[in-house]
Amino acid sequence: MMLLSSSYSGGQFPGVSPLGTRPKRSTTVVPRPVVTRATAGGVRNNLEVVGNAGTLQGMDIDELRVIVRKQLQGVELSPSSYDTAWVAMVPVQGSRQSPCFPQCVEWILQNQQEDGSWGHSAGPSGEVNKDILLSTLACVLALNIWNVGQDHIRRGLSFIGRNFSVAIDGQCAAPVGFNITFSGMLRLAIGMGLKFPVMETDIDSIFRLREVEFERDAGGTASARKAFMAYVSEGLGREQDWDHVMAYQRKNGSLFNSPSTTAASAIHSCNDRALDYLVSLTSKLGGPVPAIYPDKVYSQLCMVDTLEKMGISSDFACDIRDILDMTYSCWMQDEEEIMLDMATCAKAFRLLRMHGYDVSSEGMARFAERSSFDDSIHAYLNDTKPLLELYKSSQVHFLEEDFILENIGSWSAKLLKQQLSFNKISKSLMPEVEYALKYPFYATVEVLEHKGNIERFNVNGFQRLKSGYCGSGADKEILALAVNKFHYAQSVYQQELRYLESWVAEFRLDELKFARVIPLQSLLSAVVPLFPCELSDARIAWSQNAILTAVVDDLFDGGGSMEEMLNLVALFDKWDDHGEIGFCSSNVEIMFNAVYNTTKRIGAKAALVQKRCVIDHIAEQWQVMVRAMLTEAEWAAGKHIPATMGEYMSVAEPSFALGPIVPVSAYLLGEELPEEAVRSPEYGRLLGLASAVGRLLNDVMTYEKEMGTGKLNSVVLLQPLAAGGAASRGGGGAPAPAPASVEAARAEVRRAIQASWRDLHGLVFGSGGGSSSSIIPRPCREVFWHTGKVASVFYQEGDGYARKAMRSMANAVILEPLHLQE
């Protein structure tokens, strides 16, 4: 039986926070759900969301959603003082006497901080960082070039002097290429006659760091190094081969979509297309410019990904659909903004496929070989995020032989493991990488992922390219919504658990001493595929039928006599006329009455949704299941070994007991399922594939236990014949198979599991099931996909209910409060 046996995902390079500048808001408190907060003194309860989230006074849920929706629809780009300064340095063509973009100069004059700096702090404490020093130096240079803002220049130089030690501190996080860009601008400033109130030895230290950077043996190939040096060209100035750099120019005229690099090329090479890009950029955005442009697609996809990871994407379903429609259009037109960037392309591919868009893996072909990474800036910087995005995208394949995605998955996994082993992954990203490598995306518990992401979410997200930029203008609102939704969901789950416990007592299921009746784990099995709060009826029906199928399975698996098995099968066949049969034991009476009366209750609720009676279909599912279980019991008693895998699976699939669980719950999802839909070949295929995945996973993980009890499974069946001409049944006196034959059989079963996964994924999300021609509503198709995930989770290490880890997981999802960062 089936149940028995960070936050924002970045990675684009160059890239930008998907969420833009943070608007100023008040900092008092709204009523909060009780959560647990970690502090230096231990754990305490608090009604606030979380310390680092700040507070949101007087806002209800709808107001929070409005803010997030506004940000999602038009992601606000965070202004980059550094890039704005470089654009401000560009002169009018044919003249070096006046700026081409005076609005950028004016913005610099209007946005100096009181301490004399420009740029963003990397955290709530406002500490000085290398990005602030870099931005301040760039702004000082821009003002000095045009001989304006002398007081601004004086205050900026003073700020740099007071904090110069930060620039040479190797422990401080640095923007990409800092040792080149900062030292290059410092040399330019000194050449202009600017005086820095610092010791000569400190300035020499900066130039030594520059030489070290040039000599550094970084990751990747020579091509990766060339690309990196082109990206930080503004730090090289006249030393750069600008003809070589222009090889990286894109159709929009930019270099790497970087305003600073493009501005430097406009200064040094007078490239018309580069200037056109800057004109277009400044005309659209006014004064300041971002660290990367255009970036709308990537930024919006990151926000969609964040909302999904935090468990609140359903609140913004229409907005997400609009974004994905736009992304799909860009994909089909092969637009550079998506296709040239590793992280954007991978994230777009994954999200589009998982939302049912028909996108070919051919769009990922440019990343099929490891050289695509080794020759990139990502390799030079040992950048993990795009690598992780590629690995995730490689898992969403439908075809048995999709060599593009298989290749991407192979080399990206290898590199991620290498980065882990050499400790090259940041602490903030390491849990996500470890989790992705350990658990395939079809073996994850989304609601548990949501909880972990909420607990680790950083509302002060600060990303670094050549310059830093703030995270989302809606991070606090996202966290507040996620905390509220998770807390409410837990309260609903806990009510459902109490109801299940009372239902068990009502039908005397706890009196069945041979059976495992575990409401908590059964509810977890329902929460995994049906976690949205509003699906309570479907979840309760799933949980009840999970308990009931487990009880019936235990009867057929040694808990009852053959007389009781035959009696129960006859009762199910008669169904409403079961009084004609009678009960041969109290155990049979308890089981049948529990199934029959619970099904009547569920059927009444389903009839309201479906506008028809569905009891006959539900009864059929029970009848098919118990007949299959009886066949297995007869096989065991007679020591019968099926001649083929086909014969075995024809019984093993229905005996896995999804029939009375999944189709019944599907009736309660709010979607109409007409008779022709549930009788269609497509519906039968969905149920068959989900059952095959579960049964084969069970066989692989419980092989040794079942072999010891003489119970047949696919691993035993597929073993090459051992000495004596028969496969061992365990306990029957036949010789045990050689270890090699066992591993070969298990490998064959795993291949069958993978094939079933691919077919199921394609039927649910691909053109086979994702098209409008399907008569089965998408939410109903998806529940079969999530059913397979339940099996993967429950059988990661063995018999699902027997694992202590499963109870721990159930506690974490249903009972334990959030444990949030301070």
UniProtKB/Swiss-Prot annotation:
Keywords: Lyase, Magnesium, Metal-binding, Plant defense. Induction: By chitin oligosaccharide elicitor and UV irradiation. It is an enzyme of class 4 (lyase). Mg(2+) 3 binds at residues 698, 702, 706. Its EC number is 4.2.3.33. Mg(2+) 2 binds at residues 553, 557. Binds 3 Mg(2+) ions per subunit. Mg(2+) 1 binds at residues 553, 557. The keyword Nucleotidyltransferase does not apply. InterPro entries: Isoprenoid_synthase_dom_sf, Terpene_synth_N, Terpene_synth_N_sf, Terpene_synthase-like, Terpene_synthase_metal-bd, Terpenoid_cyclase/PrenylTrfase. It catalyses: 9alpha-copalyl diphosphate = stemar-13-ene + diphosphate. Residues 1-10 have a biased composition (Polar residues). Residues 1-29 are annotated as: Disordered. A motif (DDXXD motif) lies at residues 553-557. GO terms for molecular function: magnesium ion binding; stemar-13-ene synthase activity; terpene synthase activity. GO terms for biological process: defense response; diterpenoid biosynthetic process. Its cofactor is Mg(2+). Signal peptide: none annotated. The Asp-Asp-Xaa-Xaa-Asp/Glu (DDXXD/E) motif is important for the catalytic activity, presumably through binding to Mg(2+). Belongs to the terpene synthase family. Stemar-13-ene is a putative precursor of the phytoalexin oryzalexin S. Phytoalexins are diterpenoid secondary metabolites involved in the defense mechanism of the plant and produced in response to attack (by a pathogen, elicitor or UV irradiation). Catalyzes the conversion of syn-copalyl diphosphate to the phytoalexin precursor stemarene. This is Stemar-13-ene synthase. It comes from Oryza sativa subsp. japonica (Rice). The gene is KSL8.
